[in-house]
């Protein structure tokens, strides 16, 4: 009999693969699962829930960082700062709705001038001004 674990003799041991790698994700599925278990959100956590949640978090992070990178490039900067995150989120309708109540430190405000404060455009002088 061969020693060790059962199976075919001479077969190479398969290297373990993380759940993140199996799902094709960069964010850690195991850590999200641990946080879900320790967070007292439910008594039991299914095996697919942390994978799905991790995929959603990774997608949101990629979306925000892409828009913030575009904002940084528009401002001729190579580093993303909180101002670029603020501009990216507030100029996107869906992200603004999702993060509407979120305050970003050092984010500033969107440039906006109310219509009532803008100077009135006069196409031609009125009859009272001609006399």
From Swiss-Prot:
UniProt KW Nucleus keyword: yes
Residues bearing the modification N6-acetyllysine: 5, 8
Residues carrying N-acetylserine: 2
Species per Swiss-Prot/TrEMBL record: Candida glabrata (strain ATCC 2001 / BCRC 20586 / JCM 3761 / NBRC 0622 / NRRL Y-65 / CBS 138)
Function noted in UniProt: Core component of nucleosome which plays a central role in DNA double strand break (DSB) repair. Nucleosomes wrap and compact DNA into chromatin, limiting DNA accessibility to the cellular machineries which require DNA as a template. Histones thereby play a central role in transcription regulation, DNA repair, DNA replication and chromosomal stability. DNA accessibility is regulated via a complex set of post-translational modifications of histones, also called histone code, and nucleosome remodeling.
GO molecular function: DNA binding; protein heterodimerization activity; structural constituent of chromatin
InterPro entries: Histone-fold, Histone_H2A, Histone_H2A/H2B/H3, Histone_H2A_C, Histone_H2A_CS
Further facts: In contrast to vertebrates and insects, its C-terminus is not monoubiquitinated.
Binding partners and assembly: The nucleosome is a histone octamer containing two molecules each of H2A, H2B, H3 and H4 assembled in one H3-H4 heterotetramer and two H2A-H2B heterodimers. The octamer wraps approximately 147 bp of DNA.
List of residues that carry Phosphoserine: 128
Top-level taxonomic group: Eukaryota
Protein name, entry field: Histone H2A.1
Primary site of residence: nucleus
